[in-house]
């Protein structure tokens, strides 16, 4: 007589899901600090350098002298700039972000891991902590932006069609505007980047826990989740990015409008944008910003997770 296999299967105990799965969202507690710094620096350089031409186009769109550019002619604009100004025109200033992005992102991810380690129990890898994750992200961007802001200011000045080098631009800004010019946009940068970073980490970790509950190293999932967080955060923070751009380029010789040149505070920059462009002015460059941030954030997270995985394995 053949036994009913379904009845036998129903009595078999269901194997328990192991709760001590490796957590690739954080380095182990015994990992030295330099592992986090190296992984963060690698991620930052990859993120900012690969998508630099799109970021340069966004800066031109947001600048006071930019003509109205639409997303449908974004590729034609890139082609036109490359043809009329040279192949490397949209790469002007990349040295500045490489110099700044490495140390700044080392601080960024290092601070994030440090805060998360002290706020969240290391043995609790299964529970999601969005509020503590957001706090960690906010602390991370506050620390890293203090280091990155001068380099970002230099980058945007060079992006506005100038042939000056990083050193020449730095010297020119300091001599004509003083040290404060490198930090005019820092408060606005924090207003923009604190929610950006908080949402970035929360959306990324929420989506990875949903798509990768086993916490396994999976570059495809890291890339997908990074794209989701990057595009979402870029879209909602575009108005603040427009204000930041005005503050960073106000002293450039390419800015001819007096109202833009005198905008040295958040409120003045916002008022100048509204007076010149209206409400639509706060969304100038939103499409190239998303196009740049979606792959850039995906690259950043994928590179960071890859570097962590490599350092943990080897």
UniProtKB/Swiss-Prot annotation:
List where the protein spans the membrane. 33-52, 93-112, 130-149, 185-204, 219-238, 285-298
Compartment annotation? Mitochondrion inner membrane
Q: Other remarks on record?
A: Present with 1360 molecules/cell in log phase SD medium.
**Chief localization:** mitochondrion
Can you name one GO molecular function term for this protein?
iron ion transmembrane transporter activity
Concerning InterPro entries, the annotation shows: Mitochondrial_sb/sol_carrier, Mt_carrier_dom_sf
Membrane topology note: Multi-pass membrane protein
Q: Which purpose does this protein serve, as stated in its record?
A: MRS3 suppresses a mitochondrial splice defect in the first intron of the COB gene. It may act as a carrier, exerting its suppressor activity via modulation of solute concentrations in the mitochondrion (possibly of cations).
Q: Which PROSITE patterns match?
A: SOLCAR (PS50920)
Protein name from the UniProt record: Mitochondrial RNA-splicing protein MRS3
Q: Which Pfam families match?
A: Mito_carr
Identify its protein family: Belongs to the mitochondrial carrier (TC 2.A.29) family.
Determine if Transmembrane is one of this entry's keywords: yes
Q: What GO cellular component is one of the record's annotations?
A: mitochondrial membrane
Q: Which GO terms describe its biological process?
A: iron import into the mitochondrion; mRNA processing
**Organism listed in the record:** Saccharomyces cerevisiae (strain ATCC 204508 / S288c) (Baker's yeast)
Q: Give the UniProt keywords, A-Z.
A: Membrane, Mitochondrion, Mitochondrion inner membrane, mRNA processing, Repeat, Transmembrane, Transmembrane helix, Transport
Give the Solcar repeat ranges. 31-118, 128-210, 217-310
């Amino acid at each position: 007589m053949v036994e009913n296999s379904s009845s036998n299967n129903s009595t078999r105990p269901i194997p328990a899901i192991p709760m001590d799965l490796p957590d690739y969202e954080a380095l182990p507690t015994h990992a030295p600090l330099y592992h986090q710094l190296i992984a963060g620096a690698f991620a930052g350089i990859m993120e900012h350098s690969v998508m630099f031409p799109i970021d340069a186009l966004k800066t031109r769109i947001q600048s006071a002298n930019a003509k109205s550019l639409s997303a449908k002619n974004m590729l034609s604009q890139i082609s036109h700039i490359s043809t009329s100004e040279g192949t490397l025109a949209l790469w002007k200033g990349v040295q500045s972000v490489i110099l700044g992005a490495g140390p700044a992102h080392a601080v960024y991810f290092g601070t994030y891991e440090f805060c998360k380690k002290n706020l969240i129990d290391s043995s609790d890898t299964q529970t999601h902590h969005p509020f503590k994750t957001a706090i960690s992200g906010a602390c991370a961007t506050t620390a890293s932006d203090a280091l990155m802001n001068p380099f970002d200011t230099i980058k945007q000045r060079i992006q506005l069609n100038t042939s000056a080098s990083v050193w020449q631009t730095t010297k020119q800004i300091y001599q004509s505007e003083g040290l404060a010019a490198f930090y005019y946009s820092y408060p606005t940068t924090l207003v923009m980047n604190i929610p950006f970073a908080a949402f970035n980490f929360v959306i990324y970790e929420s989506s990875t826990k949903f798509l990768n509950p086993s916490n396994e190293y999976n570059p495809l999932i890291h890339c997908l989740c990074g794209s989701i967080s990057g595009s979402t955060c870029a879209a909602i923070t575009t108005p603040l990015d427009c204000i930041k751009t005005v503050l960073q380029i106000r002293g450039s010789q390419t800015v001819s409008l007096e109202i833009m040149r005198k905008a040295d505070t958040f409120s003045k920059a916002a008022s100048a944008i509204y007076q010149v462009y209206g409400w639509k002015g706060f969304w100038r460059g939103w499409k190239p910003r998303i196009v740049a941030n979606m792959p850039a954030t995906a690259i950043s997270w994928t590179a960071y997770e890859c570097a962590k995985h490599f350092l943990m394995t080897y």
